[in-house]
């Protein structure tokens, strides 16, 4: 036979679980009902055709500090643009959206991945021969075009669209 203390413990625990579940369910309902849903396409009669093939995006996060005010640089402790000159890619995501638009796959490319960087023309007009280096060097040396060419050549995946968020954009988003 169970002791009265055990029965009391089980009763209190059961009531607490039921009460917690009820409050959670009610809270979820309040949050769900407070979300404003908008049909952004209502009233638009002429729209472009839906894409009929898969699409690939390269999303790059850059550490460029261009565009930050002196006050923002001081507040965020980023150093000056002279100290952190140039642009390096901190984050690279290759996003594939399926033909039917029912699936998306995202691959994060580590910035220190060793890759064959194709030949490029530097800012002084000198042609540099292909070389092995960290993949984010492609972005620092030749910007988006060289990074795209590097990723396409190493992955054999065509990149259809390019999105870059620099440090200034990141700060303003957050």
Regions found by a protein language model. Give the residues of each.
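Non-catalytic, solvent-exposed segments at the cell envelope interface
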Residues: 1-173
